[in-house]
Amino acid sequence: MKIIIVGIGKVGYAIAEQMTGENHDLVVIDRNSAVLDHVDSMLDVMCVEGNGASASALLEAGVREADLLIAVSENDEVNLICCLMAKKLGAKHTVARVRNPEYFRDAPILRREIGLDMIINPENAAAQEISRILRVPSAFSVETFASGLVELIGFQTEEGDSLVGKSLIDYNRENPNSILMCAAKRGEEVIVPNGSFVPQTGDRVYVIGTPAETTRVLRSMGRAMAPIRRVSILGGSRIAQYLAWVLTDVGTHVTIVEKDEAKCLTLAEKLPKVTVIHGDGTNHDLLESEGIFHCDAFIAVTDRDEENLLMALTAKRYGVKKVVPKMSRMGYLDIVNLTGLDTVISPKAIIASQISSYVRGLANSQGSAVESLHYILGGAIEAVEFTATSATHFLDRPLSDLHFRNGLLVAAIVHNGRMEIPNGHSQIHAGDRVIVVAKKLFLQDLNDILG
């Protein structure tokens, strides 16, 4: 596919990196020549210097032949104008980054009037992911599929866990049809496990099942499942605002610490149920006097990765049971892993996976639709949700009759609203949702899983 990206900041670069990795024909537009020089040296892309909302820059980028234009500059208005111009000039599909909550609430109108095909909001996406993790505090990652019927959770195994020290065949024999372990990381090795895999203490693993089953399994291993009732947020960013809306709606007490007084006043006006504290979030005297660490979860979402990491570690030292820092620089992830923090949020990585899911769906509009896509274990594994259609080649056949590609699992099937952990007798029918977990095979169609 020919894809144009307007705006090469953190989000734009992450999307460009993902799209070039999936072998798309990519053009990037930005006003900053230094940024373009860097992108040109790192990625296989064509660069156009200019205003992405101008017809001249869009035409130079080949907008008339573009299958998709993605506008992700720092300015919402520029992104919207860019998509409007691109559609008028012939782009088949357009995606705009919209961060302002007021615009984001008007998404249906924008789609209809401007012809937008998709609106992305990294801050809202990050807030939604944090809220899912807080619902299962003993997990470091929680992803959902099939409108919430299926849950993929990541956690670190501990000594004494029922999963540890026995093969998955033996575990599944003792716990039939409950969950499926579908990915693991041991040291630097990433594994899509088969039945002979034996989990060890300290493995980072992912299991899939219904929300009720994944919760039951974690509880049976003694994991803390008490609800999160008090949350402290460092930084009055848009992520903080979106997250506060979600949490206060379910009765969670939220405190936000922000050092910019004007921003505090705005937050206090928009979030009447939230306690907003004006002050430096790195000032320990302030944090102690205000009881910021007397909470069930501490979320650090300032604009500085270093501050987020430092204060997350401080919160952990104070005994906060769930700590989540936001990281923009993926290079920091190795450092984070060494600190013992198990959960990190990266808005740009979340958006890159959303865009990848959308692009794969466009590229295969006649086949089995890609409904959602999540990258796990640092992007080494992808979990893809498909809808089986009449174009699927192996409908109504037992899975034991099929030969699948290496490094791949059919992890779950949803039929008529019921989730099944598949076995050799299971069959896929038209209309079923199928979740596939694989090492990065860039699956675009359900038929791609066959060897």
Where are these regions (language model features)?
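Cytosolic regulatory regions of ion transport systems
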Residues: 1-451
